Structures are given as structure tokens and as C-alpha cells.
Amino acid sequence: MDTLCARWARLEPHVTVVGPQDDLPRPAALLFHGCGGLRGHLPRYAEVARARGWRAYIVDSYAPRGWSRQFAMATVCTGLLLRGWERAGDVLAAIDGVSRRSDVDVSTLLLGGWSHGGWGIMEALSADRDRPGALGLADAATVPLEGVQATFLAYPYVGVAALNRMRPWRHCPKTLAMIAARDHLTTVRNAERVLAMARQCGAEVETWVADGTHSFDEPMTAPPMRFDDALSRDALNRFGHLLDDVAPAAPVHRRRRAD
């Protein structure tokens, strides 16, 4: 079983960092791909963050495990490997690792997840991290979540395999959730029911039902999913507005969390 440091040591070499070329402590967006792995749309969101003075960290969960896209499509996308609660271990390790950087404002973090990545984020927010071995980590409870000010959930996976989808969140940040009207993995009604639960815990949740398929913002996607350029641009704009809402002013130096 990994510790947070051990998990981050595996993940960090494969993290793509996008942001201003300085050492100022800036807000950070941690971005987690879907079950198909890294695709062309996440760098577009990272550039939106960079343009607003944020740092973006695109976390690859597959390269550290030695998994190809083909392998992940056959195992993760089918639910055989790396369920959401296991992916949540990557989410916590990334929060912990990024928060130790001197060029990150640890009081202003955003978690962004696409499909499977969104599932992992929701598991991280709702888990009883005091339970021994929670989320596949020996020390999951030691990660403070107070700095997580927002989440961006792009057509998060809330289907039948997400057994904990109705489990109340224990940390309830501001949330923008994109629901695909023609998502083959969930109904709009089911997705809205899950997000209504998050509102009940005190989270400010905005939902946008986009008239597209699952992964509508991902170029080169495969049927039944279909890329929609107009909706994709709308999604990027909404992501940018969320960043503005979270950190409308230039970032200032704040005390880092002690190691």
C-alpha cells in the first residue's frame, strides 16, 4: 500500500505543468483525465488556466503504472481496474504533492476531472479518510482539503459502478458540473440527482446540461461519442469563468502548509 509521498513520487515525473514562468505562489488547477487517458482537450483547459495567472497540473494516472491507452480502454473503461476510489488516491497524492511547491498558493486549488477523473474526485471528497487503508493509501487522512476551493466535473462518471455516488461529500467546494444530454453512461436525471446530493452538504453547485454526447469536448473521440467544437469552446469559457470566480484578483503570497 502506498503512502502519499510514494504515490506522488510515481506520479510527479509524468505530470505536465502549464503556467506563468515565475516562482510566485499562484492558484493551481489539478486536472485528471478520463478512462481513455491523456487526450488533446486537457491542454486546452490548462492554457485557459495559464492565461488567468493559474498554474495547471495535468496528472497522468497511466504512465506511472505502465499502462497504454489500449490497455486502459480494455480494463479501466470497462471497470476491471482502477475504480474511482482507487483513482482518488492519485487525487489526494497530487493535492499533497502540489501543495508542497513554493510556487503554489495552497489556499486556492481547483480539482478538474473528466469522466473517470471526476469519479475519482468525488470519491476523494466523500471518503472516510480516517479508515485504515482508505483509497489505497496508508495516510490518506493527512491531506488537508481546506485549500480545495472548487471542482470542475466534466460529464463525471456516476453510473452503476460508482457505488458511492450518493455518499455525502465531506468537503464541499464550489462546483461546476457539465452534464451531457446524450451521455450513454448516465441519464441526465441520474447525474442531477447525484449533484443535488452535493448541494445538500453545502456545496454551491452549478450544472450545465450541454446538448452533446459524453466527451463532447474531446477531439478524435470515438462513437457513440462525438466531438462538438461549439460546445467545447463553451465549456472552456465556463471553466475560465469558474477560475475567475475562485481567484478574481492577482494571487498574493500565503503561508505554505508545513511538511
Predicted regions and their residues:
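Short beta-strand/loop motif that positions the catalytic acidic residue
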Residues: H171, A177-I179
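C-terminal catalytic histidine-bearing segment of alpha/beta-hydrolase fold enzymes
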Residues: E204-D259
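Serine-hydrolase catalytic machinery in alpha/beta-hydrolase-like enzymes
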Residues: L4-G19, P25-V104, W119, F216-R226, ...
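Primarily recognizes the serine-hydrolase "nucleophile elbow" in alpha/beta-hydrolase
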Residues: E86-R170
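An N-terminal hydrophobic leader/cap segment in hydrolases
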Residues: M1-Q21, L111, H116-G117, M122, ...
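Conserved alpha/beta-hydrolase "acid-adjacent" motif
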Residues: H184-R193
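Acidic beta-to-alpha connecting loop that harbors the catalytic carboxylate
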Residues: A181-H184, G212-T213
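Glycine-rich His-Gly loop
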Residues: L31-G36, P156, A180-A181
